[in-house]
Amino acid sequence: TGDLLLPAAVLGLLVVLVVPLPSTILDLLLVANIAIASLMLINAITQHKALEFSSFPALLLGTTLLRLVLNIASTRLILGADASSPAAVGEVAGAVSSGFGGFVAGGSLIVGFIIFAILVIVQFVVITKGATRMSEVTARFTLDAMPGKQMAIDADLSAGLIDEQEATRRRGEITAEADFYGAMDGASKFVRGDAVAGLIITGINLVCLLYTSPS
């Protein structure tokens, strides 16, 4: 059952890309995505060591892919709404999308566009680019420090300060740390691509609302 979970999840995401979702199911998936992201954020902040949350890169990839698929699904519903009725856009897109959009934009398209421009600067230029650079530097420094750490373990073992079991544990920890930061480097690049795609999708939604708003 566990071996079939990942293929089933990937297949479900592909189905969402092709088949239009009912607004109720989309609302449930959006709420679940927000809840999972919040739990991941809290868990990541409360950890003292990176290896205490070693599954974070894989979870980050999964939730990023889920968010991208939900963005595409919500955009399909928005673009498929009746253009002659602007109210239908929010109704078809679901309560979560319309409610969050109305809360952030305050019911004004101009305010929504300004908020969108600010989010572009903050998310892409500051957060995403900075996180990508931090992941690259950390992964590089971790890999460069591996030989020195291995030599230190061998020196402690030769001096009798630690036994073979402790040396094996430390070597495994160094390898796991290098794997973690390497995976984070790849995941950060995936997140950056998702940020670009999300900004483009949001821009398309704004243009759609421009043409569907009453003159």
Task: Give, region by region, the residue ranges found by the protein language model.
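Structural signature of hydrophobic alpha-helical transmembrane segments
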Residues: 4, 27-35
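Central hydrophobic cores of alpha-helical transmembrane segments in multi-pass inner-membrane proteins
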Residues: 33-44
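Transmembrane alpha-helical segments and their cytosolic interface motifs
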Residues: 177-205
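Interfacial loop/helix-cap signal at membrane boundaries in integral membrane proteins
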Residues: 7-10, 14, 18, 38, ...
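Conserved small/polar residues in nucleotide/adenosyl-binding loops
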Residues: 211-215
